[in-house]
Amino acid sequence: MSRYVALGSSMAAGPGIKPSAPGAPFGSGRSARNYAHLVAERLSLDLVDVTFSGATTANVLTERQRSATPQIDALDGSEELVTITIGGNDVGYVPLLMSAALPRLVRRLPSIRELLDRDAREKALAGLGDALHAVGTAVRARAPRARVIFVDYLTLLPAPGVAAAPLSSEHAELGWFVAERLEEATAAAARATGCELVCAGQASREHHPWSAQPWTVGAGWPLPWRPTPFHPNAAGMRAVAELIVERIDPA
């Protein structure tokens, strides 16, 4: 059976999508129905899922996360498939959206104001391209036999100009600005490092949280019995898995 390693943040882990993956570390939010598990089932792959909620590119490459070693340590060179969904936490993308949905009084807190500050987001975005390039380069070196596929983020906002209550138009516009830069940086890193790309964002433009058939969850309080706000739901994970399967085996 071919070995498949899944790397990434909560957008790949699937926090709140039941059931949890057996043996998942505390705080990882790793679902047994995330896209990696679904792809492995469809293609009969031997899955090693090290996705972890809150992960940054540094957690993929060099830094521990809670009890987990850097995700790249899961690669042993025998992999035939590696998927990567990462980068949003480097630039505060989902925290920005969650913060924008908070009451006005809470948004005055310094840490929240910083997340909603355009200059601060631009500063964070300035280093994203290099960080994603480093991930692609390192994974290709560690897994030379593998097809390495970057999977970008599902769409989390309606089209620019469309109401996204409780987010203000200003905060929704900032969210789109970060989302577009994240998509662009992911695509550029994939091209530059010889990796492939699955464009989950483009495929989900009509399946944002405010749509009739959402693939992601919108604003709300994080509750343990449902998917985390501004993250994929079960339908979204199924859709991303299908995109990956189609990329690997178009027939």
Language-model features: locations:
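Catalytic His-Asp segment of secreted/periplasmic serine-dependent ester chemistry enzymes
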Residues: 154-251
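Short amphipathic alpha-helices and their capping/turn segments at secondary-structure boundaries
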Residues: 1-5, 64-83, 132-145, 245, ...
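Conserved SGNH/GDSL esterase-like catalytic core that processes O-acyl groups on lipids
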Residues: 21-130
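A structural motif corresponding to the C-terminal end of an alpha-helix
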Residues: 38-46, 130-149, 181-199
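Short, flexible, mixed-charge acidic loops at enzyme active sites
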Residues: 17-20, 95-110, 162-165, 209-221
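Catalytic nucleophile-elbow at a beta strand-turn-alpha helix junction centered on a G-D-S/GDSL motif
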Residues: 2-26, 91
